[in-house]
Every structure is written in structure tokens, then in C-alpha cells.
């Protein structure tokens, strides 16, 4: 069973309210639980297989509807190649959006679906940031979670609303169709750790190129 974890430390609840309150910690961390050996890990970073002269899109099919993402291949070729390679390998199939915060973002890419654990290097490698401060973190933006500089792996988040995050997270795409599905996912009931009470599942991710 694959074991991953993504911990978001940007918001806390206070005063008995479910509304988020910003703290001084504005980091989105990728962490990993220790447990069963992963069914699918890699010994090294994937080789570049995409053509930066082509246009790539992904249809992220979820249990609540589909979202089509257009990738920023020229801005973040390494990150796009990583996501596409993992998606084609079925890495995201059956993974849930394990952390959902309305009016902020939805997080996925953590096959364990948990919210606690030790830092780790999964899916078996980490790769460098491709930061671009010319692209705002606006609604529909797709970006990588990390646990510090140059620690990207498989986990990602999609912005529910425009938000002035620090430019610490590689932006590598944007939802161009099905943006209403972000609203649907962001509106689900959540429990401890901002995890949806009922699983929101990534059924599969279909990649196209032109």
C-alpha cells in the first residue's frame, strides 16, 4: 500500500469557528507516514519524455466530476513531465483529495489519505522547484506541495480561490474546464485535519497531447 501524507500548516481554527485563520506559518508541507512497503516506488527521477513544443492536458476524473487541466509546459517542464509520467503509470488512480479547505485550496496526491507522519522522500525521489513569480495563485491554479526547497514529489494542490501565497510552490498548470468541480469539492463536509467525511476520489487521470 502506498504511504504518503500532505500536511498544510497555513490555517488553524479558533473561537469555535470553522473559518480559517491565517497563522505566521505559510508553508505547505509534504510528509510521509511510515508503514507498509509501497507498492510503487521509483529509484530515480523520471527521464524527460514530454516535448515542450507540444500542448498537454489532463482530465482529472473524480467521484464528483471531471476537471481538465492545461499544463504550463514551457514554464515548468520538469514538473509537468513528472505529473504526466505518474498519471500515465496509474499512480493517482484511486487517490483521494485528503485535505479540503473552502476558500483556499484542495489537496491530493497522497495515496495514504492520512494527515500525520514523518518526513520522507517519496515517491522515491525529489526534484527541483521551477518557481515563477509572474503567475499568481489564482482560482484553478495547479501547484506542487513540498517540504522545503527542491523537495517536490507526487503531491499537489488546486486553488479554490485567488490567494497571495508566497512563491514557494511550483505552479505547473491551470484548470480550464470543470472549474465548478473545484467548488463542488471545496463545499464537501470535512472533519479532523480538513479531510472530507466522505472520500472524494481521483478515479483516474487521462493525458492528451497536441
Describe each region flagged by the PLM.
Residues 4-12:
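Sec-dependent N-terminal signal peptides
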Residues 14-210:
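Cyclophilin-like peptidyl-prolyl cis-trans isomerases
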